[in-house]
Amino acid sequence: MNLAAVALLLVSLCKPGVAQSAAAPATSPAPGATPQSTQPSQDPPDPSADNGSVPRIRVGINEVNVVFTVTDKHGKRVTDLKQADFQVVDDSKPAVEIRSFHSETNLPLQVGLLIDASNSVRDRFKFEQESAIEFLNQTIRRGYDQAMVIGFDATPEVTQDFTDNTEALGHGVRELRPGGGTALYDALYYACRDKLLKKGRAGPTRRAIILLSDGEDNLSHVTREEAIEMAQRADAIVYTISTNVSGTKGAGDKVLERIADATGGRAFFPFQIRDVTNAFAEIQDELRSQYDVSYKPADFKADGHFRTIEIVASDRKNYRVRARRGYYAPVAQ
């Protein structure tokens, strides 16, 4: 290399800022910029991934949220009670602190409509479709609530994903045609895991699933209790409407009762066709007349275990409280 070339190389290496730029950390934010978070994503993890992760629900390390319904001894909803009228018991211990308590009559809804489209419901399927469409038209508010439609026989089928467009939802309901066997538990599991959990929440939201079925299941890969667990993880209240028209409660009706009871919902048994519409109307009214409480549990452990919830009314003689039976604690990161 000649002297002129060496001199040119030395000049270029000594230019201000060259060495500093090469050594500067790529993650250093500019003054006033918001640094990139190093925390894990807050989106629910993919429950289908075999990584042992626990799907998130509305539970923080120091706060639990639960929605509940109160009725009097005649079954009429009670909507004017105060925080002092209740005690929250978490895993057999009173809550350390009540963070908030109020009547929730106007929270946005995420509603999943699960319709049994197996051969066993063929006789009254058309009427149930029209009742479901009327419910969606009356309940879903444009720009505020969202709903989806899933039909199931041997497998679940999403005929309309989450939308606030009631016309599209109605079309999704009318697309369903009865036929085939019944995989009820798989459908509930799928709706909670693959739809509700993956959708997440943009803010305070109430989740509800309305399940129309006779409660019979002959094809599912998951069990009833696994389906219930996934609904609890998704923080979904499940309302069940029986399509059994025999006039007596069978084994399927007991399944529907179990699912509703475990998630804080309610089971309806409309033995006459016109009662299906009444059941939908009851659900619509209840979704707008519930209570919401956030509290700090005692001796909380972020270990992924199931913790029981009991909302106790001070006047137990006259009031009945209906809430989900518990929740799965998140796992500490």
Regions found by a protein language model. Name each.
Residues 1-20:
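Sec-dependent N-terminal signal peptides
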Residues 19-333:
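Scaffold/interface architecture of coatomer-like assemblies
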